[in-house]
Structures are given as structure tokens and as C-alpha cells.
Amino acid sequence: MSPSNKAVLNAAPNLPLLYLFNQLVIAVILLHGTSFLTPKVQIPKLEAHTARKLAPVVTVNIVGLIFNTFCLRDVEASFFQIARGMVLPLTIVVSSFHTSSQPSSKVWIAAGIVTLGFLTGISPNKDLPVTAAPSMISIIYGLLSSLFIAIHAVLIKASLPHCNNSTIELAYWTNLGSAVIVAPLILLNGEIGTFVDQARSAEWDSRTFVYGSMVTGVFGFLLCVAGLLSIKITSPITHMFSSVSVLECGTEAPFTDV
């Protein structure tokens, strides 16, 4: 997913929030479409008291996604996982505070190894071209993204009871609520005007942005549901361990999905 997202952001670096909004709307549309095909997918009723209870998890989700998108836009795709490398250690810390429990020493050792790898990855490298070196702001974006993703993973477990323990209902609330929050930010960032100007330009190929939004929106939706199921069945920390393993395998594979 990261190389595909990066390809779209390279084609439209001035439209990060609009791109994110497109993905969220596609997820909501897919949920509505799936609900017509099978009774197992139920769209929740939009009730104010439920919205208030889910406001923290929805807000943390969209803030994390925004920082995540900004980080990916500003760094090379190969460096993105390093910039976000603190997800696992921060999830362990946040989960520890939230549950008032201490993970095993092996978990802390794993967190220490990952932290050391992160610090090594962001340290200056004289062999790296200046143009390829990540900026300080992009590293900060990555750290903030990691922090909010960690908090979000912990909040998911606590939010499921408000959605009848349904990952589908939580996915719907999360994507719809996030889209509502990011919509005014698109206007404030002037991205509608930017999109109109670029669409009128003969030099800009809008196909990468449009088709990329559709493809990554579909796969992003599937990953969202899979992640919620993983946290529901296991725990935030276990979910992050499995996610890191998958990302490592994906990093070693060629970028053939771009």
C-alpha cells in the first residue's frame, strides 16, 4: 500500500487531504454497497449519543491518518517505515498506561530493539544524497503518526462495546466520522481550488490521482476491517507485532503493486 499511496502523492503533492478524503468516502460507499449484498453487514444508526462516545477514537484516527499522509508525502517510500518505526514501542507504552499492566521483559526488549533501529535509521548518513535525506519535519510527522496510531489501537478495544462489538459498525463510524472532520480542513487548505486549477492544466495527468484514490480506497478499506478484527480478537500490542512482521515482508518484496 505504501508504494501505491506514494505514487498518488507524488502525482498530487498539493492534495493530501483531498486524497485522504476520497479514500474515506470510498470505504463508506463500499460498506453501504456490501450491506445490500449480504445481511451480515449492518449499517449502524447514526445516533448522537453513540457519536459522542466514539468521538475520541474517530478524532485520533483522522489525526493519525493526516500525519501519516504528510509523512509519506515528504519522504521516500523506502524510508517511510523507518519514519513510522516507533509504532510498536509507543503502542506498548500506551497500552501499558491504559491497562495499568506491565508487559513481559521480552516485549520490552523487542521495543528497545525497534527503538534502536529507528534511531539508527534516522541518523545522518554521509553516503545518502542530500535530496534523499529526510527533513526534520517529516520525521516529526512520522513520530506523531506513530503516537496517534498507537493511541488509536488502544481506543479501538474500548470503543467496540459502543458498536455492539461489531468491527463493521466501528469501521463505518470511523470512516464516516473521519471524512466529516477532514472535509472542512480541505477547504481551509485550499485544496478544492488547487484541484480545479490542476484539472484545467494540460500538464497534469489526473488519472493517477483518480484511479489511485479508487484502488487504494478499496484496499485501505479491507486493511481497516482486517486491523479492527485483529485488535478485537487479540490485543493492540499483538496486532502491532503482526503488522510489523507483514510490513517487513512487504518491504523485502519488489514494488510491483505500483
Where are these regions (language model features)?
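Polytopic endomembrane small-metabolite transporters, centered on the Drug/Metabolite Transporter
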Residues: 1-258
